[in-house]
A protein has these predicted regions:
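Conserved hydrophobic/amphipathic secondary-structure segments
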Residues: 1-176, 241-249
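Active-site acidic-Proline motif in GNAT/NAT acetyltransferases
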Residues: 45, 182-183
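An extracytoplasmic/periplasmic, membrane-proximal ligand-sensing/linker region
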Residues: 129, 133-134, 156-158, 174, ...
Length: 251
């Protein structure tokens, strides 16, 4: 049995993306996801924006890559909660954006997965760090960030429509690193693989080794991933069209 490992964005792309991907993610059988990726917006502490509400009245210059989460999340928030993120698009990936933030070429960024950036750049955060987290672009949020009082961007929606648009787009981050098998794989084998997947993801020794490698494990089981994907693909054409519009930068 072949097992596929993809990014969560590849599941959403056929529905709302601009590229012509010819597959139906809803047909596959999902074993689970290694991560529930909570994406965040960040700002340098010396920037004029100290909290997400400030970004609704004060411009924040953010770094972004073309057709990436760093661009999409900032654009989405500009449309749905009326932030004033001014995107500097053209950075070739997340590392150049991080370097630009450190050099103060840009004042912040959106579309960074907290479980990853907190591991790779732990010195950025905390009382002596140079960065602050403005908001979580996620439906539920990361427990540690919730405990710190970091708000969810969706909570600043002024209408149900704005909230629904964000929720549909943000939902794909719940399955950040999904694993899948083909539609024809027998159900009993899928069930066995799902159990084995979660047993691995929750094994204490595996988690220790993952942390040594700088990987954060926050697994989501197969049935939940399957349910979420089914819900996304059951969205109305009207809502999907609104999400597409919200991902289009202003001219």
């Amino acid at each position: 049995t072949w097992i596929g490992a993809i990014f969560g964005g590849a599941i959403l792309e056929p529905l709302i993306g601009t590229t012509k991907i010819h597959h139906d993610p809803n047909r596959f059988q999902y074993l689970g996801s290694a991560n529930d990726d909570v994406y965040v917006c960040l700002a340098r502490k010396d920037a004029p924006v100290k909290k997400i509400e400030d970004a609704m009245t004060t411009e924040l210059i953010v770094g972004a890559s073309m057709a990436s989460s760093s661009a999409d999340f900032a654009t989405m928030l500009n449309h749905e909660i009326h932030t004033k993120f001014r995107e500097v698009v053209g950075y070739n990936g997340s590392r150049p954006i991080m370097l630009a933030m450190e050099k103060n070429e840009v004042q912040g960024a959106c579309g960074f997965a907290w479980p990853s950036i907190n591991v790779t750049n732990p010195n950025w955060f905390g009382p002596e760090g140079m960065m602050r987290v403005l908001a979580q672009t996620h439906v539920k949020g990361y427990p540690a960030l919730n405990a710190m009082g970091i708000p969810l961007a969706r909570d600043f929606a002024k209408t149900d429509e704005e909230r629904e648009v964000m929720d549909l787009y943000f939902s794909h981050t719940t399955f950040g690193r999904p694993y899948l098998v083909a539609p024809e794989v027998p159900k009993d084998r899928v069930e066995a693989l799902r159990k084995a997947f979660m047993a691995t993801m929750t094994d204490p020794e595996f988690i220790i080794e993952a942390k040594k490698a700088g990987l954060d494990i926050d697994a989501v089981d197969g049935p939940e991933v399957q349910r979420l994907i089914g819900k996304i693909y059951a969205a109305s054409p009207d809502l999907i069209a609104k999400v597409k519009r919200a991902l289009q930068p202003d001219p």
